Amino acid sequence: VGTYYLATVEGDQPRVRPFGTVLIYEGKLYIQTGRKKAVSKQLAKNPKAEICAFKDGVWLRVAGELVDDDRYEVKKAMLDAYPELRSMYDENDGNTQVLYFKNATATFSSFTAPPEEMQF
């Protein structure tokens, strides 16, 4: 998948950090983090977030609300997709957090074509 950047808000200050986990599960776009991290606390206060990725001259932005999904099955699916995370996370550890985008807009942009948008 590569790296993308997740933006959240802490008070009135934007916060951006690199992420690398992404999973389509039951037709929803999921990301993963740890409940102990600042990003988890920021999303609990304000679930609006945006991710941005760039590849081959095209950038993708996905903006929406991130919804916590505490089901064992989706946490296991995420960790099975990224086995290297098992040294830090486990679906039963109480720390592993998976979230999916809701009321989201994906925008594909480049310098050579008009932006394309889709809602999901």
Locate each region found by the language model.
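Charged, gly/pro-rich active-site loop segments
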Residues: 61-120
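Short glycine/serine/proline-enriched coil/turn segments at secondary-structure junctions
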Residues: 13, 57-58
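A short mixed-secondary-structure module that forms the rim of ligand-binding clefts
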Residues: 22-57
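Conserved beta-strand in the GNAT
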Residues: 18-20
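General beta-strand recognition
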Residues: 5, 29-30, 61, 107
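A short, compositionally biased
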Residues: 1-2, 45-47, 102-103
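A short, Trp-centered hydrophobic/proline-enriched beta-strand micro-motif
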Residues: 1-12, 49-52
